[in-house]
Amino acid sequence: MRILGLDLGTKTLGVALSDEMGWTAQGIETIKINEAEGDYGLDRLSELMKDYNVEKIVLGFPKNMNGTIGPRGEASQTFAKLLETAYNVPVVLWDERLTTMAAEKMLIAADVSRQKRKKVIDKMAAVMILQGYLDSLN
């Protein structure tokens, strides 16, 4: 069973995919979206869902440090409902606090240029979200 991991932003959607055994997460791509206009890249997501026979989605759920849900968390909840309706698969909201910061630190430590980091940060965050979920299962 393959699981898709997503990191939702206002302009991009980071995408990661599990291996068939559900042990590791790999970054797939970053999809350009426009949240303000309701464009969430669903056409591309549909292709990925079919190509990889995805049976579950793990969506990053940004909470405030005190555990409350702010505007970005509410946006993720709304997006989760949209995904469940569009694809008829379970969507798990996974606490993503600090994943983008951790991903950026990893890329800096790997001496990745600022320009390249900007292109891959959301995909890396999606990997960290999905890997955290997979680790919790195993």
UniProtKB/Swiss-Prot annotation:
Q: Which cysteines are joined by disulfide bonds?
A: none
Superkingdom, according to UniProt? Bacteria
Q: What is its main location?
A: cytoplasm
Q: Name one GO molecular function term.
A: nuclease activity
Q: What class of enzyme is it?
A: hydrolase
Q: Name one GO cellular component term.
A: cytosol
EC number per UniProt: 3.1.-.-
**For this chain's UniProt record, which GO biological process terms are given?**
rRNA 5'-end processing
| Keywords, sorted A to Z | Cytoplasm, Hydrolase, Nuclease, Ribosome biogenesis
- List the subcellular locations: Cytoplasm
Q: Name one Pfam family in it.
A: RuvX
Role: Could be a nuclease involved in processing of the 5'-end of pre-16S rRNA.
Q: Into which family does the record put it?
A: Belongs to the YqgF nuclease family.
This protein is called Putative pre-16S rRNA nuclease
